[in-house]
Amino acid sequence: MKFLPRSLLILALCAFSPLSWSQGALDPPRYDYNVLCQKRANVADGFSREAMMQCLASQRHAYELIRKNWHQLPEEVQTGCDEQTRATRVLDYVSLHSCIVTQLRRIPPAPQ
């Protein structure tokens, strides 16, 4: 039992490591976009179901675009864009996708 606190510390450190964000670069990071969309759907006139549905649809679409190509992205793009998105504290797949597209444009084409 004397090792229990140390084990919990190691487990906690692993849970918050950058490697756990991308799950070994096989899957994109997981963001809870429901919270984001709920915040965006709360407008001056109250809750907008239409805004909520549009937000959810755009997040799902961006996630699917990211998921399809995630394993092919350079690790520095995966990590860099995830870190940039998390730094904004708005876990948003549309922003993550925009970052990925921007970073990929900066990579020079392979010589032929």
Regions found by a protein language model. Give the residues of each.
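Mitochondrial intermembrane space
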Residues: 19-112
